[in-house]
Amino acid sequence: MRIVEVRELAVPLEGGVANAVVNFSEHTVSLVAVVTDVVRHGRRVAGLGFNSIGRFAQGGILRDRMIPRLLAAAPDSLLDAGGARFDAGKVLAVLLRNEKPGGHGDRAGAAAAIEQAIWDLNAKLADEPAYMTIARAFGRVPSGPVEVYTGGGYYYAPGTGQTLRDEFQRYRDMGFESFKMKIGGAPLLQDMKRVEEALDVAGSGDHLMVDANGRFDLETALAYAQELQPLALRWFEEIGDPLDYRLNAEVIEAYGGAVATGENLFSAIDTLNLVRFGGMRPGHDVFQMDPGLSYGITEYARMLQVLESHGFDRRQAIPHGGHLINLHVVVGLGLGACEAYPGVFQPFGGYSPQCEIRNARVRPSEAAGFGLEEKKELSAAIRRLLA
């Protein structure tokens, strides 16, 4: 059994939404297929993966460095001890051959696209959903339906006919009960009016989260924290620069409520530094590292080891992303909850119709692999990739 081809395709995100820092209208995602010599039903078995949402496609790194390394590797060196499956850890090591340590940026997403395609491939070879493959690999029992909340809460210009209240009411009608909204793209007073508008739909602070997308300096962060503190929100997310651990710790001390961060940290050592210096509290704060931006599920499991070795519960891990791959990761690894982007960040955001949302909980379908083929918004890109 061997890999015969690796294909990649840059797929643009649809919708043109923006947060306080980034406009996503120019963003792309790398969709990858790892094709094998195994033939079933007249077609070669291929694993699909992508590098999550928010960091651009990485075609250059994939084509120039990682795909050639993988195709040059001895086929047996990529297999597990039994020889019947691919070893994602061995694949990742090959992808990173001769890469210097540190600098965990775009290459982390490039590697993740391929590494996660290996998990999809192994699950298809076993004819089982990816969450079962993931759970077995790490000695876990898959969880049942997991809590799901909506990312969203964008800014709407007056006169557009759309409001934040309308957006969140739509999500509630779809079965969601907890909602996340953007802040930092308007003055504090205006943002607080938006928060009150969102609370009218959410019902209480423990069903509402706010996300500053790393925009705030310490002074602004503390001003927001003072206004938000009485509302007892579920969490205050990405307050300042992701690598400003001191700011994170100082806001935590002043704010008292739960904070969430980590989506822009891409390695186990970055996670360790957050734990050491960021003021994060066991049983209280939320870690949002995203496997698709962080070298894949292999490195993400190392991040969880860092958390648990420092007294944190893996249920404090709620990955960024809001897509099918991370849904399987949450179920397979027994994490706290998952995000969803209903109708946003297509064709990758959100889940397939087979993933029923009921009572604010969701579970993957029983399709083999991650079930990306069941997501109709992705079907055209997958057909193009595999043609």
Regions found by a protein language model. Give the residues of each.
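Extended hydrophobic packing segments that form well-structured cores
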Residues: V4, A368-A387
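Conserved, mostly hydrophobic/aromatic
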Residues: V32, R44, I114, D127, ...
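Metal-dependent enolase-superfamily TIM-barrel catalytic cores that perform enediolate-based chemistry
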Residues: T133-Y255
